[in-house]
């Protein structure tokens, strides 16, 4: 595909303008089911977000991919404020459509549960090609923003894929096929990644446009190698500064292992700083000193170099790989006859139409 582009909230840009990219992060979370888990997920401060983004830019960063889907924190208008504040500094924002893990949706009455897959695909396609709904598909009224989604999210739970999650994976794959839009999947604690990748590919998605997130929380370098070699997808390691799960050194050494195996083209990085105390400027509003997006540059990249990851590999991880995986693909038609037998059998077993 000539003239490869990524879709930001302010319009399509050549992928060469993405620069150093954080492939999975958050600025605004305007409520939703995550807030019931912890109040730190409520993130409404536009000024703090702009300051955080500027610190990211000051250290050489350019693009942030915000992975908040409709009804799980996404705020189109506030994110547009942030994007407009940093556009002249070289900052870009990509937003998502799609879904999170099944835990966040009523299994009987949510629109993910009751609306036919074909219609949900149309709704997601519209968010990518016409504009995101400012009301996040919260009710019967839809108001399209000028801002379009540039990535599709799906999610799975811990150690299992719920039937609604398989439905959301089908929506993501079919939407990607029809629009060329890339996909990123939340896997709870890095489990079910291999199955997620195989299901997406089984529905017809291009593995070159798929990122699987959170495998850093399942620190098994041999599993990473297996997922990449068997499916060809990209792993988004989104967890520097998460010592409650593992030390940074373990993540750095696991990345080094993959690079040494010749798999550096299948790695992206991010901070996934989706809580108030994961960002420096939000932390200050609560009277606390915390790390933030600058941690990637100040602490983690020097550590990658210390463990022996080459500058060339780091450039691939931060620039070349996001440029490839976030570029829109050629549009295709979805052919149900090409869906894998394994996926069709699983749909039947889970009673999915």
Curated annotation (Swiss-Prot):
Cofactor note: Binds 2 Zn(2+) ions per subunit.
Transmembrane segments: none
Catalytic reaction equation(s): a 1,4-lactone + H2O = a 4-hydroxyacid + H(+); D-xylono-1,4-lactone 5-phosphate + H2O = 5-phospho-D-xylonate + H(+); L-arabino-1,4-lactone 5-phosphate + H2O = 5-phospho-L-arabinonate + H(+)
GO molecular function terms listed in the Swiss-Prot or TrEMBL record: 1,4-lactonase activity; zinc ion binding
Modified-residue entries (N6-carboxylysine), positions: 153
Chain residues that bind Zn(2+) 2: 153, 186, 214
Entry binding sites for substrate: 244-245, 275-278
Binding-site residues, Zn(2+) 1: 24, 26, 153, 272
One family name in Pfam for this protein: PTE
CC cofactor: Zn(2+)
EC numbers on record: 3.1.1.104, 3.1.1.25
Top-level enzyme category: hydrolase
Annotated keywords: Hydrolase, Metal-binding, Zinc
Single biological process term from Gene Ontology: catabolic process
Role: Catalyzes the hydrolysis of D-xylono-1,4-lactone-5-phosphate and L-arabino-1,4-lactone-5-phosphate. Also able to hydrolyze carboxy 1,4-lactones.
Family: Belongs to the metallo-dependent hydrolases superfamily. Phosphotriesterase family.
Identification of the protein by name: Phospho-furanose lactonase
Natural source organism: Mycoplasmopsis synoviae (strain 53)
